[in-house]
Amino acid sequence: MADSKPLRTLDGDPVAVEALLQDVFGIVVDEAILKGTSASEKVCEWKEPEELKQLLDLELQSQGESREQILERCRTVIHYSVKTGHPRFFNQLFSGLDPHALAGRIITESLNTSQYTYEIAPVFVLMEEEVLKKLRALVGWNSGDGVFCPGGSISNMYAMNLARFQRYPDCKQRGLRALPPLALFTSKECHYSITKGAAFLGLGTDSVRVVKADERGRMIPEDLERQIILAEAEGSVPFLVSATSGTTVLGAFDPLDAIADVCQRHGLWFHVDAAWGGSVLLSRTHRHLLDGIQRADSVAWNPHKLLAAGLQCSALLLRDTSNLLKRCHGSQASYLFQQDKFYDVALDTGDKVVQCGRRVDCLKLWLMWKAQGGQGLERRIDQAFALTRYLVEEIKKREGFELVMEPEFVNVCFWFVPPSLRGKKESPDYSQRLSQVAPVLKERMVKKGTMMIGYQPHGTRANFFRMVVANPILAQADIDFLLGELELLGQDL
């Protein structure tokens, strides 16, 4: 039988290759896309690790398998994977499945090129610059630079490295020997990549000075200034402030204008981690949350989050026009960046980054933007805010639900208080018992497969749920289901 042939025999057989891929695409459309985004299907099919290993048959063998076996493996992989495009996947800051962005991702994978030179990626070199130009314009810059990075964490680390290089350019050659003790400043609500970046870049986690935040999670500029003065008095050299627009848990937006004033007074690089909240710049109604972002030196922005461009799509944007990226990271590899090419070598952007090979991440965003237009993407943002308001009002109406605080963004943080704890807030063990509720409900919902929502403690607060309203296909019915399902799962607690 033809189907029993090992797939290695398809090399050089275009008819067989086409037949295989048609079948695979059919499985992807049916199982991952149509079922994976249907509210009538499960979000996940939970299995314990050992059982899942057996079901997947993960061991790699010396002999190839038949086409039918491979197709069945594709079905199995999809079946047991979490469907992040599902309207009831609320677990992360990314969700949803934009079909135009997905088309861009499929084309990207099919062409399998690297973003480093114009000669092998002419379309994408030009496209990346146009997309970055548009993002910079939304920030408020008429000129500048930028690059797509493998995730927002790396974007933040790039900003830290650029700030250090601008202050001490000798460190590129001499390393840490060229540096005095440095200090950088960020809110206690910042993303953990700032601390990781300090360790990765050799600055050490002690170089990160944590600035106080207010009750809503926003950096307090007065404490920032106090921390800067204190660091100088202790013999450190301040060089960077990292503010956050859209914190991971509370969804807070730091007061950028006031922070920019502090940075200007002290001559510090001003970075804004807008990985989560940057897409709000598309909304004329809500972009005021990022007032002052145009004063930043660098901005991290992840369209794969609120815009649903698909993982990963992470831009680092710079106000700099002095070719700082290339001066900081360039190594002039002669086999790749020859200076006597037959075209303008300024188009070879690969020496701007620390990577060599670099994935094409601009096509999915460009194609989605072409299809939706800026107005369509703006409606997507505004709809997320409107659904957030709906959820907040529903929480206020229902017994057993309590907001942690009024949301500023599309992160809605709340407690589900089960029947046994209602009216007992004054009990000495109330917080401890309440903290046990979210983990139990999370286990129940995941094993049932009905939805996924994250939880966490925060400071002295007991574990609470963080609902992320981001999926473009999310509707009021999904909000109602979320609340009803929590009531159902927790009725015996």
From Swiss-Prot:
Which InterPro entries does the entry mention?
PyrdxlP-dep_de-COase, PyrdxlP-dep_Trfase, PyrdxlP-dep_Trfase_major, Pyridoxal-P_BS
- From what superkingdom does this record's organism come? Eukaryota
Q: In which pathway does it act?
A: Organosulfur biosynthesis; taurine biosynthesis; hypotaurine from L-cysteine: step 2/2
Question: Residue positions of the PTM N6-(pyridoxal phosphate)lysine?
Answer: 305
Its quaternary organisation is: Homodimer.
Q: What does this protein do?
A: Catalyzes the decarboxylation of L-aspartate, 3-sulfino-L-alanine (cysteine sulfinic acid), and L-cysteate to beta-alanine, hypotaurine and taurine, respectively. The preferred substrate is 3-sulfino-L-alanine. Does not exhibit any decarboxylation activity toward glutamate.
Protein name according to UniProt:
Cysteine sulfinic acid decarboxylase
Q: Per its UniProt record, what Gene3D superfamilies does this chain match?
A: 3.90.1150.170, Type I PLP-dependent aspartate aminotransferase-like (Major domain)
Instruction: Report the cofactors.
Output: pyridoxal 5'-phosphate
Q: Tissue specificity, please? A: Expressed in kidney and liver not detected in lymphoid tissues and lung. Expressed in kidney, liver and brain. 7 and 4 times higher expression in kidney and liver than in brain, respectively. Low level of detection in skeletal muscle. Expressed in brain, olfactory bulb, liver, skeletal muscle and kidney with the highest expression in liver and lowest in skeletal muscle (at protein level).
Instruction: Identify the GO cellular component terms for this protein.
Output: cytoplasm
The reaction(s) annotated as catalysed by this protein in its Swiss-Prot or TrEMBL entry are: L-aspartate + H(+) = beta-alanine + CO2; 3-sulfino-L-alanine + H(+) = hypotaurine + CO2; L-cysteate + H(+) = taurine + CO2
Q: State the organism named in the record.
A: Mus musculus (Mouse)
